[in-house]
From Swiss-Prot:
InterPro entries: Ig-like_dom (IPR007110), Ig-like_dom_sf (IPR036179), Ig-like_fold (IPR013783), Ig_sub (IPR003599), Ig_V-set (IPR013106), TCR_beta_variable (IPR050413). Residues 1-21 form the signal peptide. PANTHER family: T CELL RECEPTOR BETA VARIABLE 4-1, T-CELL RECEPTOR BETA CHAIN. GO terms for biological process: adaptive immune response; cell surface receptor signaling pathway. The lineage of its organism: Eukaryota, Metazoa, Chordata, Craniata, Vertebrata. This is T-cell receptor beta chain V region 86T1. Disulfide bonds join C41-C109. Glycans are attached at N36, N75. It comes from the Eukaryota.
Amino acid sequence: MSCRLLLYVSLCLVETALMNTKITQSPRYLILGRANKSLECEQHLGHNAMYWYKQSAEKPPELMFLYNLKQLIRNETVPSRFIPECPDSSKLLLHISAVDPEDSAVYFCASSHGQGVSGNTLYFGEGSRLIVV
């Protein structure tokens, strides 16, 4: 990941703390053993692109999935047990089957008017912290 992209994503995360982005995520905190779980995100900004990011401890956020106009763009390095679902343009789900300790991280949902980070502002939710024990 380039330093420029990392800086951009970091600034977006800081900006999120300062404004009401109208993006909600649930649950906020989740501690569980090896089970199946779903994370939910909903945006009320009229955006047509939605994203899931994973931020593991002491690592930069990693783009997992992008839906643009309900079309999926997948990061091929993401394990197949992560399954995104976009039931409509304002909601994005992340289903995780057979949760593994390496899945412990904060999962951020984001949205934007268009695909990609060039020229588009990403608006982030507060994150869902998943701890697998």
